[in-house]
């Protein structure tokens, strides 16, 4: 699916499709547009499976889950579906919905077909000269 530090694969993905489960998940992020998705994928990190860099004890679980999640989003986009990273959720609600020890929600990805009348928010992207340097 995606690379991870030392191939630990510290992730779990939960597809949320039933109306009952979607209603509970929507309590974690109460935005009107979010409620219109036909399904969600909850991206979880298994804190017990994360690789930790020995030099400074930096755990790489968030990075690994982010890489796998973006692979998922790119695959959905390739199939004509719309996705959006949602990280501004209520962590207390997510812990209640996913109480497994060592699991922590990293992102919620709503997935669906983009409405034809959906406004496109063109964003200014930094130019290469702003983000790239050479030494």
Regions found by a protein language model. Give the residues of each.
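Short active-site-adjacent structural elements
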Residues: 50-51, 93-96, 116-120
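C-terminal helix-cap and adjacent tail motif
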Residues: 107-135
